[in-house]
């Protein structure tokens, strides 16, 4: 199944959780922090401005992005957990 977000929404696959600390300690599943980075899988057509024009989104499919820990809504599609969030919930794009 494919999902197409509407307007200024973006679908993001969250980066895998870290299961080890930098010091090598293995974390149990409930202790691992959810990463606040991910990959953009789909984008909406853009924000509808007051004059009716559509402003395209600044992010595109494939971008690696940083967002707030509690940003977006989690949905499960074909057994995979994805986030649907507004473009304004994204803090920046990781380049390089």
UniProtKB/Swiss-Prot annotation:
Keyword Chaperone appears in the UniProt entry: yes
A Gene Ontology molecular function term of the record: protein folding chaperone
Main location: cytoplasm
Pfam families cross-referenced by the UniProt entry: Cpn10
Similarity annotation: Belongs to the GroES chaperonin family.
Subunit structure: Heptamer of 7 subunits arranged in a ring. Interacts with the chaperonin GroEL.
Protein name: Co-chaperonin GroES
């Amino acid at each position: 199944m494919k999902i197409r977000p509407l307007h200024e929404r973006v679908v993001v696959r969250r980066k895998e959780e870290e299961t080890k600390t930098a010091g090598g300690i293995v974390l149990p599943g409930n202790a691992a922090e959810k990463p606040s980075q991910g990959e953009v899988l789909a984008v909406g057509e853009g924000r509808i401005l007051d004059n009716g024009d559509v402003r395209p989104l600044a992010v595109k499919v494939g971008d690696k992005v940083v967002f707030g820990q509690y940003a977006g809504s989690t949905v499960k599609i074909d057994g995979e957990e994805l986030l649907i969030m507004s473009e304004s919930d994204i803090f920046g794009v990781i380049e390089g």
